Amino acid sequence: MGKYDFTSLPNRLGHHTYKWKETETDSEVLPAWIADMDFVVLPEIRQAVQTYADQLVYGYTYASEDLIKEVQKWEATQYGYNFDKEALVFIEGVVPAISTAIQTFTKEGEAVLINTPVYPPFARSVKLNNRRLITNSLVEKDGLFEIDFDQLEKDLVEEEVKLYILCNPHNPGGRVWEKEVLEKIGQLCQKHGVLLVSDEIHQDLTLFGHKHQSFNTINPAFKNFAIVLSSATKTFNIAGTKNSYAVIENPKLRLAFQKHLLANNQHEISGLGYLATEAAYRYGKDWLEELKQVFEDHINYVVDLFGKETKIKVMKPQGTYLIWLDFSAYDLTDETLQELLRNEAKVILNRGLDFGEEGSLHARLNVAMPKSLLQEVCQRIVTTFAKR
């Protein structure tokens, strides 16, 4: 038994928790969708939040030197990534940072590329900013997503792509892109003058011996056209505190990005976010190691159960706590699949089509919950699909 509690289910009802919103009106429904965790938070984060709450004033705040040092230390010790503090830019979230990058480095009507299926806000951010969305389909091979580099280069050139948004580790497929893959991506971007935004928010959640490589550690030359994004919020389940960061080593790109933050009045961050992030990186390493063991156990459980009891094809993730499920072996429409999950199994998974057209007859399962709850979710799915 570990030091930390990953078996208790915190009561999230009545707290305006987005993940559990539908359960508040239908108590039979179990949520296994949006990417946050149903675990008790790291005790030191809770203490930091309580200390903040005990203050008599909740005014404007700034990023302390202690916070900056903790972020630098985390990146250096976990990933061998060393950078000057001037390269660090705090922002309220990774998705707002992506939109800021789109607004800063592209013009309306210009092309932005993403690898689909992928986290839905990528496409949304491109479209709502009136940029031209280019989707480069990932290819499934041996149970993992791969990039078709011939098609990628063709897309970059023919569509005159200005910005490439990469998801590493990949959501929803859980692919941890290796150094060789990132090297090829960087070479293509360098060759064709494409800026790259690397969303690395799941970087800490690599599993089964896989290791994350930050894009800015692959080749020093790549730093000239890269904006790397990350946060403690996904790893430590503190998304509600609203804090993330960009590492932009090219001063020209960084100044342009910061100027746009100021223009959008996005340069001020929650004091709660600063404190929670600092506590997470200072005290959270052991908690994280236990958490990853829990995820590996949960993922193996899902793979084994669905493999034995259903025709659902499971893409076993190399990282993240998200599993991409393929229901195409059943004679279903996308609408019927959603109806079966929501109304018969009484579970909420993310709809595959939200990740792109490649997500047809797929769904994304979140395993970041106590094992007992995960077992109930999965048994409901098994019962529903064993009949078909």
Region annotations inferred by a language model:
Residues M1-G59:
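N-terminal "arm"/small-domain region of PLP-dependent enzymes with the aminotransferase-like
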Residues M1-Y4, L9, E65-L67, V71, ...:
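Conserved long hydrophobic alpha-helices within structured protein cores
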Residues E24-L30, A35-Q50, F83-D84, V89-R388:
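PLP-dependent class I/II
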Residues G59-E92:
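Conserved N-terminal alpha-helix of the aminotransferase class I/II PLP-enzyme fold
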